[in-house]
Amino acid sequence: MSVHTTDAKPDSEVDRLLDGLNPQQRQAVVHEGSPLLIVAGAGSGKTTVLARRIAYLIAARSVGVSQILAITFTNKAAAEMRERVARLVGDHTGPSMWVSTFHSTCVRILRNQASLIGGLNSNFSIYDVDDSRSLLQMIGQDMGLDIKRYSPRLMANAISNLKNELIDAESAVANLSSDTDDLARTVATVYGEYQRRLRTANALDFDDLIGETVGILQAFPQIAEHYRRRFRHVLVDEYQDTNHAQYVLVRELVGHGARNSPDDMPPGELCVVGDADQSIYAFRGSTISNIEDFERDYPDTTTILLEQNYRSTQNILSAANSVIARNFGRRDKRLWTDAGKGELIVGYVSDNEHDEAKFIADEIDALVGGGEITYDDVAVLYRANNLSRSLEEVFIPTGIPYKVVGGFCFYESKEIRDLIAYLRVLDNPGDAVSMRRILNTPRRGIGDRAEACVSVYAENTGTSFADALQAVAEGKVPMLNTRSVKAIAGFVALLDDLRCRVDDDLGELVESVLERSGYLRELESSTDPQELARLDNLNELVSFAHEFSTEQANAAALAKSLHTPEDEDVPDTGALAAFLEKVSLMSDTDQIPENNSGVVTLMTLHAAKGLEFPVVFVTGWEDGMLPHMRTLGDPTELSEERRLAYVGITRARQRLYLSRAITRSSWGQPILNPESRFLREIPPELIDWRRSILTDSYSTPASGASRFGRVRPSSIRSGASKRALLVLAPGDRVTHDKYGLGRVEEVSGVGESAISLIDFGSSGRIKLMHNHAPVTKL
């Protein structure tokens, strides 16, 4: 492969790349040689540093753009990185410089190396979570499994966990032993069948994209060497969020510890950026030890700390520093800014979640009405998706425009998934999940029995579902009645006709699918208002397809005008395959409204990672909510919850609101929650409490509440001598005035001498006498 280098720029241009950087940022940009770990605190300018480092490689060190691989965690971050680099060095990087997510990077490698994986070719489909679950549903039914006990969701999560650890189906079976439980045995069996059907469908799931790429690099040294020679500079953003498979992928691409290397080529330059204090995706398989142990894995590492914050005021940063400092074993790091203290954090204790939502709505109205901000300056963050309901119930009648990020996505709607399934079948006829989805959509007289017969025929003859349909159309499957055969023959002819149009403009192809399949006609003939909304969504997809075709053509023309060589590591799969790939790799963060959208953003704390807003409301500061109830007994999980609180606080630029509800509905019942232990960790002088005592409606004196509004109802807290004897049992949920929320583990004794061992999370496991402890049963 030819390597295209860029002539070094004059010193003045190089100096421009370093303008405005603080000493630590400058050191990170110009570093050469040894692996580089940039520990970048929230808002410390890591994106600026990464973009400047890439530009510096090109302009000052004459590194060819094709020798650079930059990996991000979201499409949005990748697009921003490309734009920043283009502004710094000119828009001549073309397709040769890879700036993309882990999954997109691996797709590009796999498209070119698919022939090395048995049963796969370069136009493979990418199964998302719903596709995987649909396939697992089929497998479960065919294997006669109890779907309630072994649900597709459970099986998908278990298989995903194995793949993230690079454990293949054969190894999962080999690892079984005599004392292995039924679930693990079932997972191993289903895993093998799942992989077999994926190959038959010429498909990979999300986890396969990483795992199969690692497999190729490890099994074929010459391929690994090819990519190591190409990518002499590898940069990885958000390294604290990598899982084991991604960790191994990076090592293979760089060449550290490479096995079977054909020669002694030195490893590539590796630069990773991350912050262990913002590691919040353990539930997705991320491994915080990847960044914590980086200096051990790469002994000659240079480590640079970025602690100067360019986003938030000092009051906000001081609150964040105080919370995260309680995590044990972390790298000492304190964020600071020279932007001044700023306004105090606003605290609010509400009676319930509806009062909390009304307070937030009133504050937003006041700020917008006063001309201080616009709606798109505001984000409301919460620990769990269900907390958006009360906000929406208040925002709608109030007239506050909003968008829920991570809620129901455009690409998850039935009509869009139906149309995408048609397109996927045209691109990859072996995609059985998509084929079976559209077989009778819209209704064309192919019932469940006919579909089952086709499936059985495919299984018995060892052919794909598509080949089985063709056999039916040719009259080779006698078990079907004439009506079903005719309907299936018509469906096969429809696909053949549409397949002749795949080289048309993508927007025109989508229109052809809608019209010729009868899908559009069925919706237009309906009087259901919901069907009209589906039409609007389909019109939007048609527009997007036209735009995508135009963008593809413009990009090709630009590359040609700049004489940018085509990237030989990326085969031209055509506009349809590129479009399907883009849709498949969409993530929640791609739904985030633009800055000028004119809407308030509602999202979970997890989804807010990497974002910032002038005004941020973080709701639900209660033990049981933040931290979440299920984490209270596990110090490791509680540490991650504290990191989540830290992430929420550091999203705010100028104004930060922290609110909690005294009672919050759960399963239709009001639940009394104490204030979050994290809230108690913020210095009181940083918070301006707009409301911190109970309303008269609770009939509780003000002296019965702490500065955070902790409830001490007279009916419960009127003194041990006057209250009913507390009766507890293992598993009961309690709150203690000092230790917060906990769960009862053991109870000994009876009556007034009863003693409970209670797990209070980070406060420890404590024995308390029922008759004297300030404990309330929830």
Curated annotation (Swiss-Prot):
Primary role: DNA-dependent ATPase, acting on dsDNA with a 3'-ssDNA tail, unwinding with 3'-to 5'-polarity. Also highly efficient on nicked DNA. Involved in the post-incision events of nucleotide excision repair.
Catalysed reaction(s) here are:
Couples ATP hydrolysis with the unwinding of duplex DNA by translocating in the 3'-5' direction; ATP + H2O = ADP + phosphate + H(+)
Under InterPro entries, the record lists:
DExx_box_DNA_helicase_dom_sf, DNA_helicase_UvrD-like_C, DNA_helicase_UvrD/REP, P-loop_NTPase, UvrD-like_ATP-bd
Q: What's the protein name?
A: ATP-dependent DNA helicase UvrD1
Binding residues annotated for ATP, in chain numbering:
G43, S44, G45, K46, T47, T48, R311
Residue ranges annotated for the UvrD-like helicase ATP-binding domain, each copy included = 19-313
Lineage, uppermost ranks: Bacteria, Bacillati, Actinomycetota, Actinomycetes, Mycobacteriales
**CDD domains tied to this protein:** DEXQc_UvrD, SF1_C_UvrD
| GO terms, biological process | recombinational repair
What UniProt keywords apply to this chain's record, in alphabetical order? ATP-binding, DNA damage, DNA repair, DNA-binding, Helicase, Hydrolase, Isomerase, Nucleotide-binding
EC class, as a word, reads isomerase
Which Pfam families has this protein been placed in? PcrA_UvrD_tudor, UvrD-helicase, UvrD_C
Q: Can you state the subunit structure given in the record?
A: Monomer.
| Family per similarity comment | Belongs to the helicase family. UvrD subfamily.
**Record-listed E.C. numbers:** 5.6.2.4
Q: Does the keyword Transport apply?
A: no
Cofactor requirements of the protein: Mg(2+)
